[in-house]
Swiss-Prot record:
Span of the signal peptide: 1-19
Subcellular location: Secreted
This protein's name: Secreted phosphoprotein 24
Alphabetically ordered keywords of this record: Disulfide bond, Phosphoprotein, Secreted, Signal
Species this protein is from: Salmo salar (Atlantic salmon)
Name of the encoding gene: spp2
Keyword DNA repair: no
GO cellular component: extracellular region
Post-translational modification summary for this protein: Multiply phosphorylated at serine residues.
PANTHER family reported for this sequence: SECRETED PHOSPHOPROTEIN 24 (PTHR15444:SF4)
Length: 196
C-alpha cells in the first residue's frame, strides 16, 4: 500500500510537468542568451545615437512549451552608455553615461528559446520611474510603434493670393458670407444623467 501511494504521487507529479526542467546552471546560460538577443533588438529599434546596456534584470517566469522549448518572461532595466551606436561595440562592455538626465527604462520581454534559435516574442519598455528626465511614460512596443506626426503643426494661416478670388474659381456660384452653426452629431457613446 505504501508503494502504491509513492507511485501515485510520482505519477501525478510527472503529469503536471511538460518538457524537461531547467536547472539553475542551464537557466543562467539560457537567460544570458535571451538577454543578448533582446538587447540587440532594443539597440536596433530604439537606441538613438548611443547604445543601451542592461543595468538590472530578473526572470519572472519560465513557460515550458515543449521539449527544450521555453518562453522566458524577463524584467530588466536599461540605461544609455558612452558607446555610439555606429561603433559596433558590445553594449555590455560599454560604461554607463554619467549625469542627471541619462535615459533609462524598465523593460519586460517574452523570449522564446529553443535548441536552434532564440526569438523575441514581445518587448515593452517604458521610462524608468527613477529617471528624472520626464514624468510622462514612453512606451516602446515591438508589435505597435507609435509615430507622433503633426501634419499641420508647422503651417501658419493661409494667406490670400492676389488676383484670385472665389468668384473667379467658381464663376457660376455666388458665395455670401454667412455664419453656419455646426450641427452636433450624436456619437452614440454618451451617457445622460437620467434613468429611463
Amino acid at each position: 500500500m505504501k508503494w502504491c501511494g509513492v507511485l501515485m504521487v510520482a505519477l501525478l507529479q510527472s503529469l503536471c510537468c511538460s518538457g524537461l526542467p531547467l536547472y539553475q546552471s542551464e537557466l543562467a546560460s539560457t537567460a544570458d542568451k535571451a538577454l543578448v538577443v533582446t538587447m540587440t533588438q532594443v539597440n536596433n529599434l530604439y537606441a538613438g545615437l548611443r547604445l543601451y546596456r542592461v543595468s538590472r534584470g530578473s526572470i519572472k517566469r519560465v513557460v515550458p512549451l515543449g521539449l527544450n522549448t521555453y518562453d522566458l518572461i524577463m524584467n530588466f532595466g536599461i540605461k544609455e552608455t558612452d558607446c555610439l551606436k555606429s561603433s559596433g561595440e558590445d553594449p555590455q562592455r560599454c560604461a554607463f553615461r554619467v549625469g542627471f538626465f541619462v535615459p533609462a527604462a524598465s523593460c519586460t520581454a517574452r523570449v522564446r528559446v529553443t535548441a536552434e534559435f532564440t526569438q523575441v516574442v514581445s518587448l515593452n519598455c517604458g521610462q524608468d520611474s527613477s529617471s528624472s528626465e520626464s514624468s510622462s511614460e514612453e512606451n516602446f512596443t515591438r508589435k505597435r510603434q507609435q509615430l507622433n506626426v503633426q501634419p499641420f503643426g508647422n503651417r501658419g494661416p493661409v494667406l490670400p493670393v492676389p488676383g484670385f478670388s472665389e468668384a473667379t474659381r467658381f464663376p457660376s456660384h455666388s458665395f455670401s458670407r454667412q455664419e453656419v452653426e455646426p450641427q452636433p452629431i450624436p456619437r452614440g457613446d454618451s451617457f445622460g444623467n437620467h434613468l429611463e
